[in-house]
Amino acid sequence: MVQAPQKTITLDEFLQLAETKPASEYIKGAIVQKPMPQGKHSTIQGELITRINAAGKPQRIAWAFPELRCTFGGRSIVPDVAIFLWNRIPLDADGEIANTFNAHPDWTIEILSPAQSQTKVTNNILHCLNAGGQMG
C-alpha cells in the first residue's frame, strides 16, 4: 500500500490547532499523537506526581505537572511528567501560573507505553536535555 506523504506545517500553525485527546506533539514539522494512557501508565504517572510535589511544592523547590505542553527549540511536546524548578515556572501578569510554557522542563519523565516508539520517547528526552534540562 502506498501512503501519501504527510503535509508539514509550521510550529505556529500547529499551536493554532485545537488540542487533541490524547495530546498531539509537534516534532520536526510533523504532528504526532501520543497514545491514550492506560491504567498502569496513569497509576505510575499519578504516583510520581504526588510524591514529587509532596517533596518539592511545600519548600517551593519544584512543581511536577502531568501532560503539560512545553514548547521550545522548535518543538512542542507533552511529557508524561514535566518538572519545573520553582523559579522557572512561567507566571502570567497576575503572578499566577501561566497557561503557556514556552520553556524546557528541568526534569522530564516519559512512561513508555506498549504503543509508543522508544526512539520517539528517547528523542523527546534528549531534546529536553539538549535545551538545558537537568534530567530525563
Features from the language model and the residues they span:
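Gly/Pro/Ser/Thr-rich low-complexity, intrinsically disordered segments predominantly at protein N-termini
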Residues: 1-135
